[in-house]
From Swiss-Prot:
Keywords: Ribonucleoprotein, Ribosomal protein, RNA-binding, rRNA-binding. GO terms for biological process: translation. One of the primary rRNA binding proteins, it binds directly to 16S rRNA central domain where it helps coordinate assembly of the platform of the 30S subunit. The keyword Lyase does not apply. Gene3D superfamilies: 3.30.1370.30, 3.30.1490.10. GO terms for cellular component: ribonucleoprotein complex; ribosome. Part of the 30S ribosomal subunit. Contacts proteins S5 and S12. This is Small ribosomal subunit protein uS8. One of its GO terms (molecular function) is rRNA binding. Belongs to the universal ribosomal protein uS8 family.
Amino acid sequence: MAANDTIADMLTRIRNANLARHQTTQVPATKMTRSIAKVLREEGFIAEIEEAEEGVKHNLVISLKYKGKNRQPLITALKRVSKPGLRVYSNRKELPRVLGGIGIAIISTSSGIMTDREARRQNLGGEVLCYVW
């Protein structure tokens, strides 16, 4: 099934897999989902990313991380901010801080997809894609 909002689809699949305590989840591979998964891996929210091909379909297999004996998910929440019907942009001075810096905001800038911290360091603004904490 084709999704109109691949980012929301990706976040929902990760959220559902976390709630069900799955080790991995599959997400349709696009440039945007690859970039977001790469940021999540660099920030330590997910373990690893692999590419899987099933005929014509290309998927990303995302390995999730858990902590402790009870396998508590490292990702507490994922929230989509900018949506196809209502885009949310932020200039470099007004980039959001998620939970006072505990979480991250994933920003789409002219230099690619990055966290709010990286965007601040590079003095860039852009579209606020989602919050992760």
